[in-house]
Amino acid sequence: MPASFVSAPARRVEIARTILSQLPEWFGIPAATEEYITDAAHEPCFVCEKDGAPVGFLCLKETGRSTVELAVMGVLKPCHRKGYGRALVDAAVAYARQTGYEFMQVKTVQMGKYEEYDRTNRFYLSCGFKEFEVFPTLWDEWNPCQIYVLSLNR
């Protein structure tokens, strides 16, 4: 189940809307979700499909000359733990290396706050990301922001 690059901006938006609308446990703030969706039009994005339909996607955003952020990622719940997320991260890492980035970062809610996000944290750790820093009030006090980083140097 390889992930593929999505070149058409309208298709990126369509995929983001389709996936995120089905993941309210992670994307339950409408304004924030809409921002992820509209930003997808301007970001490098990857998709995994099953039977011709998108089941997961990931978008990247440059945050510095050497760093790219995994800006948003979603995989439909029935497809969790089936390799789709790993395929998306692998494709994003390959793209980031090819593009010349040295680091990838991702933000999520700190481990220990919500079970859904604990699974997300464990996934990023399993992909090789390392804990970098926690910003307790970046989003709000109920959602402390954990930043993970991944070195893209081999």
Where are the model-predicted features located?
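Short amphipathic alpha-helix that is part of the acyltransferase structural core
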Residues: 1-31
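Short hydrophobic/aromatic beta-strand or adjacent loop that forms the aromatic wall/cage
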Residues: 43, 143-148
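Conserved beta-strand in the GNAT
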Residues: 47, 53-61, 67-74
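A short, internal acetyl-CoA/4′-phosphopantetheine-binding micro-motif in the GNAT/acyltransferase core
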Residues: 73-81, 110-112
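Conserved acetyl-CoA pyrophosphate-binding loop and the N-cap/start of the following alpha-helix
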Residues: 79, 83-91
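Conserved GNAT acetyl-CoA-binding A-motif
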Residues: 96-116
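Short glycine/proline-centered loop/turn elements that form peptide/ligand docking sites
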Residues: 115-120, 134-144
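Conserved active-site tyrosine of GNAT-family acetyltransferases
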Residues: 124, 129
